């Protein structure tokens, strides 16, 4: 919610978008990141609604490392850490090679086609899923990392993790906001 102070911009609401919008955003995010060769699959977007139809406007996607601070993401921070861990473990275990130079030609080939935006986006997303090994990653996580949520819950519930968060908040927030933010 861009109208809120920095530490309240990432809402705690979930399941507030129609499934079609969620899938559209997934495709856009994967496409942008695959195009640039980034493996941190994030994309900020602004939404406009006209006549009941959503239009999404990706913003700040030239930033391969968006805001990952616990003070910004608060409730969502553990999800981010788990996502990083899953991807890092997958890459290490499968010896995934890092793409050092972008290969944009397949994206440009799609762009040249006489297709609607949605049809092109479907093709971009299919290409992105292949480049980012989405099916292999999901299978790997299902086979080897199903315990990750329990481990993360224990870790983030530990006094050491809570203290680390409190120290970060104390470094950035006024004293009267520290307890409220770290409860």
Model segments located where?
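Phosphate-binding core of ATP-grasp and ATP-grasp-like enzymes
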Residues: 1-12, 26-41, 47-57, 61-71
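C-terminal active-site "lid" helix and adjoining low-complexity regulatory extension at the edge
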Residues: 20, 35, 49-183
């Amino acid at each position: 919610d861009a109208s809120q102070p920095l530490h309240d911009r990432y809402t705690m609401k979930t399941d507030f978008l129609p499934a079609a919008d969620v899938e559209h955003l997934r495709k856009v995010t994967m496409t942008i990141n695959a195009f640039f060769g980034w493996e941190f699959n994030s994309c900020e977007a602004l939404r406009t609604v006209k006549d009941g139809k959503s239009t999404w406007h990706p913003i700040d996607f030239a930033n391969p490392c968006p805001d990952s601070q616990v003070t910004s993401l608060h409730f969502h921070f553990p999800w981010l850490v788990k996502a990083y861990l899953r991807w890092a473990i997958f890459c290490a275990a499968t010896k995934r090679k890092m793409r050092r130079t972008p290969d944009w030609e397949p994206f440009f080939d799609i762009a040249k086609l006489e297709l609607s935006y949605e049809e092109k986006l479907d093709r971009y997303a299919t290409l992105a899923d292949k480049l980012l090994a989405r099916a292999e990653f999901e299978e790997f996580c299902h086979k080897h990392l199903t315990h990750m949520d329990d481990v993360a819950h224990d870790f983030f519930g530990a006094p050491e993790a809570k203290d680390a968060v409190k120290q970060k908040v104390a470094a950035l927030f006024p004293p009267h906001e520290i307890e409220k933010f770290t409860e």
